[in-house]
């Protein structure tokens, strides 16, 4: 072996350190929070994370936070999806209130999925952009919480069943969030009020590619169209998963306006296929939709539907596992 000069040795050592540290850097960054890899969501400890949880209409019932969140936690839920408002449709949830929500959810050992509800069903980009601007305005609550807070950019933005226009919107929205320094895992709801999964199948990969962090999960809301029967549930899940994309069912019920929903199939296939799900919603649905209430009040007893979601063979109590940070 040829003798190495001192300068050469230093150069070699420096090169080796660069290789070692450089290869470790992406892994360390990913481990600071939730991340997507190979079409699956992982928590900051490197464990696959399957959401088993409940939606809570916080923005409409702001005073119930300290009652509702502990009650939801008692079901065994590992995640709670929180309705927030940017002030365009409902009463705004400001920075300090969001910080408090995160603290309460965290104290109850659940992951907080935060969503802006004001853009629901709207097709104009301004509504989506308003949601993005809201997240940027409260980013102090999000940055540093990547291991316990996930951002669902806008609830059911793009009501029309048009995948191309839906994708165009998110391909602008996601880079804007990332450029602002928000690195949390993002969730994007399907077009068609969340019930048009073909939008994800056709355009989800291009939306995912627009994320510099490659840390986006897609969400189907399964009601009377996307979740009407077992065959539909199964194919809708498989069609997205076959594209190599991470998927959750961000909302579902047991029934909806125009027909039945197979909540049993959603939970069963969610377990079999590793798809997270979040049932809609804890309580407080309007008259005529109160069959969607899981409980009779913020600390109320479970309804029949709630009992199914919590206690069924494939329900929360039998399938939920807490995130590794807890």
Predicted feature residues:
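NAD-dependent ADP-ribosyltransferases
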Residues: 1-2, 46
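Membrane-insertive, amphipathic helical modules of secreted toxins and fusogens
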Residues: 2-5, 10, 71-73, 79
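Sec-dependent N-terminal signal peptides of Gram-positive bacterial secreted proteins and lipoproteins
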Residues: 3-27
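Mature, Sec-exported extracytoplasmic domains of Gram-positive
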Residues: 30-50, 54, 78-80, 93-97, ...
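Extracellular glycoside hydrolase catalytic/binding regions
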Residues: 33-34, 62, 132-136, 140-150, ...
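Aromatic-lined substrate-binding rim segments of carbohydrate-active enzymes
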Residues: 64-121, 128-136, 171, 175-180, ...
């Amino acid at each position: 072996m040829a003798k190495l000069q001192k300068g050469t040795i230093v150069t070699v050592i420096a090169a080796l350190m660069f290789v070692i540290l450089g290869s470790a850097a992406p892994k360390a960054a990913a481990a600071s929070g939730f991340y997507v890899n190979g079409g699956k969501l992982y928590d900051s400890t490197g464990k696959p994370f399957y959401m088993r949880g409940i939606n809570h209409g916080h923005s409409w019932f702001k005073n119930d936070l300290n009652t509702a969140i502990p009650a939801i936690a008692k079901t065994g839920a590992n995640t709670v999806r929180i309705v927030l408002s940017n002030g365009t449709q409902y009463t705004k949830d400001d920075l300090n209130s969001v910080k408090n929500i995160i603290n309460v959810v965290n104290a109850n050992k659940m992951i907080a999925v935060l969503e802006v509800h004001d853009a629901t069903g709207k097709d104009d980009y301004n509504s989506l952009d308003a949601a993005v601007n809201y997240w940027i305005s409260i980013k102090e609550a999000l940055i540093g919480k990547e291991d316990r807070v996930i951002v669902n950019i806008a609830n059911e933005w793009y009501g029309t069943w048009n995948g191309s226009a839906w994708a165009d919107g998110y391909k602008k929205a996601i880079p804007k969030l990332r450029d602002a320094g928000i690195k949390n895992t993002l969730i994007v709801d399907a077009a068609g009020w969340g019930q048009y999964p073909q939008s994800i199948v056709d355009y989800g990969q291009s939306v995912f590619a627009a994320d510099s962090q490659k840390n986006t999960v897609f969400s189907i809301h399964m009601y009377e169209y996307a979740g009407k029967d077992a065959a539909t549930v199964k194919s809708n899940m498989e069609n997205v998963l076959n594209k190599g994309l991470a998927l959750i069912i961000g909302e579902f019920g047991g029934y909806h306006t125009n027909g039945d929903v197979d909540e049993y199939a959603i939970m069963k296939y969610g377990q079999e296929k590793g798809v997270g799900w979040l049932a809609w919603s804890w309580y407080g649905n309007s008259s005529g939709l109160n069959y969607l209430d899981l409980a009779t009040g913020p600390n109320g007893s479970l309804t029949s539907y709630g009992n199914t979601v919590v206690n069924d063979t494939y329900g929360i109590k039998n399938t939920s596992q807490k995130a590794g940070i807890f």
